[in-house]
């Protein structure tokens, strides 16, 4: 199905203004996700004259990258807590005062119907519940836009290890959220571990709360880091500002005397009621622990991240094709395989905030009727070319290696929702020769808890040997939790409309 023909703004009208009297109705664009990519997409779409609705599930724009302090405890200088804060404030303020952009916060997208199911000219129908997730009066809305931009981001991937379910073991993303959003110290003695450049800002943020960071332990060895980051160094010239950020983190680490050690991993956490110590071991190139290198460190908190997993529920529900690496496949326009549906940010590859901003701008511009070859997109296209290369470098340098499964013991919990241990998964796989995730879920209940496999799904796939291209754990007809009463009452209570001017009921 081809997208509707975009309206042409009247001569002399503001770029983000409404069409002149008698002109065709403005093209409608729905953007899901108000992080860097979503904000950039919404702004670019408005500059093309589209009517925009911007949705986010939380109560503030900015996403995880620009996470705010609570209104009850504001900072006199919040800029100091964030990179690119002026970029965020410029984007947010422009959209917030623009009558052609409706920002809907607390908006949970729970389902997307593809065009055939929707039965209309719109590429998809997007069903949303607006209100606090624990509230009893959430309001239903259904959007049928001319174009949909998905910018849903990613979440931490944390590999299991003995003791990872103890209180005091945090994902690095949660640690960053506590530091940025609450200014809360997780403990007095903290270890940061896992893989990827995200460990550096997390350590800096945790140290800024007053905690003593005992070390940052990167699982990848120096050889892997060299392989990922040093080839074709001229490609990094355009990303010089990343060097400035790195220098800032190095300065923070030196100031706080934080060791950075490669080829080491936290392979176990110990404690009774909460974490009291961790075992750090040297690992080989495959991430298998090297016997005799174990070292026990007393801690009261540990923050772990082994990269990020893109949030694919909505792209899959919309019918978008994925790459073999399980990101959304897009072309030069950020268009997916579904006409009228675009994707930007971490769901197309883990490339960082600069790539997300560039992709978002391109997606919003094209969704509103523009072309990726338009002159005013030249800077964004150039930035995308520069920064999307980071995704491949990050994977080469810090990508998860298969030896991590040797950390596990039979009683190590893999699925935390259903408390399914590794031993049960291993025994079931060996007894039934079942490698399919569906049969494993039904037999062991792994992935059937409240998170529906968002946390453990890919881990279980790797343990049972499911094909890497499987999307079983990401395919959810209902993308977010809702009450049976909300589902039953959808038809009479849902407000069905096209996105329009701010203030629409």
What residue spans do the PLM features occupy?
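FAD-site-proximal beta/loop scaffold in flavoenzymes
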Residues: 171-179, 301-351, 380
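Short hydrophobic core segments
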Residues: 32, 143-153, 298-306
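Core beta-strand elements of the Rossmann-like FAD/NAD(P) dinucleotide-binding domain
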Residues: 27, 136-147, 290-300
């Amino acid at each position: 199905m081809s997208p509707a023909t975009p309206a042409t703004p009247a001569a002399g009208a503001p770029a983000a203004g409404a069409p002149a009297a008698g002109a065709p109705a403005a093209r409608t664009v729905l953007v899901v996700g108000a992080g860097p990519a979503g904000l950039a997409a919404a702004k670019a779409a408005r500059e093309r004259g589209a009517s925009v609705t911007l949705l986010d599930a939380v109560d503030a724009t900015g996403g995880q990258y620009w996470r705010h302090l609570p209104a009850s405890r504001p900072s006199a200088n919040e800029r100091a807590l964030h990179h690119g804060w002026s970029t965020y404030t410029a984007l947010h303020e422009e959209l917030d005062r623009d009558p052609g952009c409706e920002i809907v916060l607390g908006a949970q997208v729970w389902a997307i119907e593809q065009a055939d199911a929707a039965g209309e000219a719109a590429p998809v129908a997007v069903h949303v519940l607006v209100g606090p997730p624990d509230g009893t009066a959430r309001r239903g809305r259904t959007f049928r836009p001319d174009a949909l931009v998905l910018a849903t981001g990613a979440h931490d991937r944390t590999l299991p290890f003995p003791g990872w379910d103890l209180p005091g073991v945090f994902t690095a993303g949660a640690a960053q959220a506590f530091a940025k959003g609450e200014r809360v110290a997780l403990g007095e003695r903290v270890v940061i571990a896992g893989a990827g450049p995200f460990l550096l800002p997390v350590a800096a943020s945790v140290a800024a709360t007053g905690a003593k960071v005992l070390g940052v332990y990167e699982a990848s060895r120096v050889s892997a880091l060299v392989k990922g980051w040093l080839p074709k160094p001229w490609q990094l010239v355009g990303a010089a500002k990343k060097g400035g950020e790195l220098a800032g983190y190095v300065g923070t680490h030196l100031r706080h005397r934080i060791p950075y050690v490669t080829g080491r991993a936290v392979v176990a956490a110990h404690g009774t009621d909460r974490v009291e110590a961790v075992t750090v071991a040297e690992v080989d190139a495959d991430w298998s622990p090297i016997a005799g290198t174990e070292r026990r460190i007393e801690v009261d908190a540990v923050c772990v991240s082994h990269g990020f997993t893109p949030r694919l529920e909505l792209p899959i529900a919309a019918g978008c094709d994925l790459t073999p690496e399980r990101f959304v496949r897009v072309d030069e326009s950020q268009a997916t395989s579904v006409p009228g549906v675009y994707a930007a940010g971490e769901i197309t590859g883990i490339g960082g905030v600069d790539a997300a901003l560039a992709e978002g701008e391109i997606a919003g511009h094209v969704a509103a009727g523009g072309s990726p070859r338009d002159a005013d997109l030249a800077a964004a296209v150039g930035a995308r070319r520069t920064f999307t290369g980071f995704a491949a470098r990050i994977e080469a340098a810090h990508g998860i290696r298969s030896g991590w499964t040797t950390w596990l013991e039979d009683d190590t919990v893999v699925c935390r929702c259903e408390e399914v241990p590794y031993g049960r998964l291993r025994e079931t796989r060996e007894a039934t020769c079942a490698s399919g995730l569906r049969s494993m879920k039904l037999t062991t209940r792994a992935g059937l808890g409240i998170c529906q496999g968002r946390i453990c799904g890919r881990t279980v796939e790797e343990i049972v040997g499911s094909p890497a291209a499987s999307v079983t754990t990401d395919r959810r007809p209902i993308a977010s939790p809702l009450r049976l009463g909300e589902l039953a009452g959808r038809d009479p209570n849902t407000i069905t409309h096209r996105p329009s001017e701010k203030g629409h009921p």
